[in-house]
Amino acid sequence: TFVNEYKGTINTYVREGDTAIELRTLGFNMPVNSILTGKVKVDLKYNYGVPYLTANAGTDDESITVTESNEAAEPIEATIADLLANKYLNDLVTIKNFTFSKEEYQTGKFNYYANDGEQKIMIYDKFNKVGGVAELTEGEVYNVTGLYGAIFKGTPEILPTQKVTAGTSTGINNITTSAADNAPIFNLAGQKVGKGYKGVVIKAGKKMIQ
């Protein structure tokens, strides 16, 4: 189990085999990393397409055993494409080496994204801002571990369960630099010139002396 609280709601996520689900405020204690066995009566509900289980009049802990454990659930190494395909819903995942970006939707308020080429998902720092997402730098590469626990306007959201860490560059910057080095060269009149041309030129959108 992974347990957190959000505005008075107890969010408990459990995994069985390759499937996970949220147990939302069932009314009895299920500590972090505990193992649940038995059965419990609940209602299945959906929040923007994400399933969760919630208490009803018959919910109690009489037929369920909660065994505390120190062994934490291992995150699944996933990709942005996996989440866009709705894999690992409600499960604990790690996404490595994504590029961070943000978009201002209201003055001083931002949506945050993990990008992989043309694809992206949102990062929602829901649980006490443990991920430190607001302090990340646009264009930098990071790793995030969290729950694929929400979908916002059709876009998957990962909810960090620990601080976002620095990733490893995949060499894209070197490819970009090489492309700039090989960019065509123009003089100030807009005529294409060769590397032997002397004077002020425009290359890759920048003026320079050659």
Protein language model regions, located:
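Structural motif
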Residues: E16, D116, L188, K203-A204
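Short, small/polar residue-rich loop motifs at catalytic or cofactor-binding pockets
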Residues: N86-Y88, S178-D181, K195
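Residue-level detector of functionally pivotal "anchor" positions at catalytic/ligand-binding pockets or at interdomain
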Residues: A166-A189
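C-terminal tail/sorting-segment detector
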Residues: V200-Q210
